Amino acid sequence: MWRVCARRAQNVAPWAGLEARWTALQEVPGTPRVTSRSGPAPARRNSVTTGYGGVRALCGWTPSSGATPRNRLLLQLLGSPGRRYYSLPPHQKVPLPSLSPTMQAGTIARWEKKEGDKINEGDLIAEVETDKATVGFESLEECYMAKILVAEGTRDVPIGAIICITVGKPEDIEAFKNYTLDSSAAPTPQAAPAPTPAATASPPTPSAQAPGSSYPPHMQVLLPALSPTMTMGTVQRWEKKVGEKLSEGDLLAEIETDKATIGFEVQEEGYLAKILVPEGTRDVPLGTPLCIIVEKEADISAFADYRPTEVTDLKPQVPPPTPPPVAAVPPTPQPLAPTPSAPCPATPAGPKGRVFVSPLAKKLAVEKGIDLTQVKGTGPDGRITKKDIDSFVPSKVAPAPAAVVPPTGPGMAPVPTGVFTDIPISNIRRVIAQRLMQSKQTIPHYYLSIDVNMGEVLLVRKELNKILEGRSKISVNDFIIKASALACLKVPEANSSWMDTVIRQNHVVDVSVAVSTPAGLITPIVFNAHIKGVETIANDVVSLATKAREGKLQPHEFQGGTFTISNLGMFGIKNFSAIINPPQACILAIGASEDKLVPADNEKGFDVASMMSVTLSCDHRVVDGAVGAQWLAEFRKYLEKPITMLL
């Protein structure tokens, strides 16, 4: 056999001394005698025979026969490389796909299937957080989950990275129990037989990065990306205490992102064993361990002194001490600056009739056809959780709504006693400052103003509200949104974005509406405003504005937009100039309406009209002055003749 092998591989220098080793191995007592391979030599000679696998094949290696005497002897002769692809059952390596046009990497938010589970075609395998949203990753064929290679919460997984292994038969799952990505890597030839696992395991070296090695089974909960632009967050409030039981869908903490304060929910049942980041801690980087969750209540005490290095330096930030007043008065404590241990509620109760519900509970309620107004929430501030939906028994009489808690905000602080107060800068306020500064410094703004006769719109609005009485209420701002969207279709240059290398002209009009909240300015989006009726727009605006003020907006509801409207007319502001919201090219500033004398074809020669002043801020890189004027002309035409919005 060796002569056949050596003859075919005679041009391979690394194998020159193998004949002597082959003979020596066969002399070892107890080693089975292996004769030359029977049968004719292979007819095909076009395969590569200069590599490890090629020489093994020429020497009679038979992968299908498993651990035969011949195979064991060849492994000792050639040096085993460890487990290789062809030594495993048939399987499929599942790579991370591109789930958005601009996606370069993703985060495994949650695995929907566990190792050993059967996967049917169309089943959701995992939820992957892209640069745009969290997207479900579905299976394209029937199979079984053999091995998960990328753990939940792993961030910045590049596209194409292998995230799991699937097999066609359930009996093949066991073969991948210890499979790792390194298992299929090209091995380094070994000069001796593979040692036993006990011999290869080196003693663990002390490392502060592995504090959980001597702890009971547990899960580190990392700070996730709760908005596409989030790089860090502030732990506003912990809704659970150490030792409390956690159920799927329970609100764990309130996290302040760069856009809003968002509830962070529990994905699975367990017990809160340790809080690693205290309330009020600011600028916590993404991926930082926030807390420890265990499956068994008895394991909680083991984590009393748990201290991972990632969070040892994270402490609640206290505002700089306020200098004492100049006047000679007895020094008094400064109660105005909120301490991290007792922050203001991140999410004040909403107006009468508002239902607080977790996303998971809301989804289950829709599936079961449950009216959320009839469900009594047992979560924080009356929040409805998954447990409430599961235990809900429908009744004919809906329970009385919970008492409305008066909203509290940053302004409702104790009476000042010094000459000034230092207010900590929130993440939202910091981002607003950065973006507005960037806009004014990098975008060449110019401004165009025009007066619009609102008489016809006011008449149409009055008639429509009579028709919709008890169903919806349309505002003047809803007509403005509709007219703006239609004007953007007429003058698409105003519905464009500066993208550094190109000007992107958008084919749909998503109108961002500026809303003032206690936390700062935010711009929820009325999507596809150009094809929606004013009633639908009115309902969208009311819903979005309410969610914005309560900090309940989801990232996709305020990220994006192609055109922005800012309305200060309700405050009596006659006119103002707004700052462009990049990468958009325009923003429309709406002033108050006031009665003015205008020329008219009547006996008096004049009439009294309700005139509204608007100012369009334009990016001169995208919209030239004449183009901006054309847009305002179209906008005024739609409002002064609202019937044309039906064309």
From Swiss-Prot:
Keywords on record: Acetylation, Acyltransferase, Carbohydrate metabolism, Glucose metabolism, Lipoyl, Mitochondrion, Phosphoprotein, Repeat, Transferase, Transit peptide, Tricarboxylic acid cycle
Reaction it catalyzes: N(6)-[(R)-dihydrolipoyl]-L-lysyl-[protein] + acetyl-CoA = N(6)-[(R)-S(8)-acetyldihydrolipoyl]-L-lysyl-[protein] + CoA
Cross-referenced InterPro entries: 2-oxoA_DH_lipoyl-BS, 2-oxoacid_DH_actylTfrase, Biotin_lipoyl, CAT-like_dom_sf, E2/Pdx1, E3-bd_dom_sf, LAT1, PSBD
Keyword Phosphoprotein: yes
Residues in Lipoyl-binding domain copies: 91-167, 218-294
Entry-annotated residues carrying Phosphoserine: 100
Cofactor note: Binds 2 lipoyl cofactors covalently.
Any GO MF annotation of the entry: dihydrolipoyllysine-residue acetyltransferase activity
Known cofactor(s): (R)-lipoate
Location of the region described as Disordered in the Swiss-Prot/TrEMBL record: 29-49, 184-219, 312-346
Pfam families (UniProt xref): 2-oxoacid_dh, Biotin_lipoyl, E3_binding
Keyword Nucleus among UniProt keywords: no
Compositionally biased residues, Low complexity: 197-211
Segments forming domain Peripheral subunit-binding (PSBD): 356-393
EC class name: transferase
FT transit peptide: 1-86
Residue numbers carrying N6-lipoyllysine: 132, 259
Biased composition (Pro residues): 317-346
Positions where N6-succinyllysine occurs in the chain: 473, 547
Active-site residue numbers: 620, 624
Binding partners and assembly: Part of the pyruvate dehydrogenase complex (PDHc) that is a multi-enzyme complex composed of multiple copies of three enzymes, pyruvate dehydrogenase (subunits PDH1A and PDHB, E1 component), dihydrolipoamide acetyltransferase (DLAT, E2 component), and dihydrolipoamide dehydrogenase (DLD, E3 component) to which is added an additional protein the E3-binding protein (PDHX, E3BP). In terms of structural architecture, the E2 and E3BP components assemble into a 60meric central core with icosahedral symmetry. The central core is decorated with E1 and E3 proteins.
Disease connection: Primary biliary cirrhosis is a chronic, progressive cholestatic liver disease characterized by the presence of antimitochondrial autoantibodies in patients' serum. It manifests with inflammatory obliteration of intra-hepatic bile duct, leading to liver cell damage and cirrhosis. Patients with primary biliary cirrhosis show autoantibodies against the E2 component of pyruvate dehydrogenase complex. Pyruvate dehydrogenase E2 deficiency: Pyruvate dehydrogenase (PDH) deficiency is a major cause of primary lactic acidosis and neurological dysfunction in infancy and early childhood. In this form of PDH deficiency episodic dystonia is the major neurological manifestation, with other more common features of pyruvate dehydrogenase deficiency, such as hypotonia and ataxia, being less prominent.
Family: Belongs to the 2-oxoacid dehydrogenase family.
Protein name per Swiss-Prot or TrEMBL: Dihydrolipoyllysine-residue acetyltransferase component of pyruvate dehydrogenase complex, mitochondrial
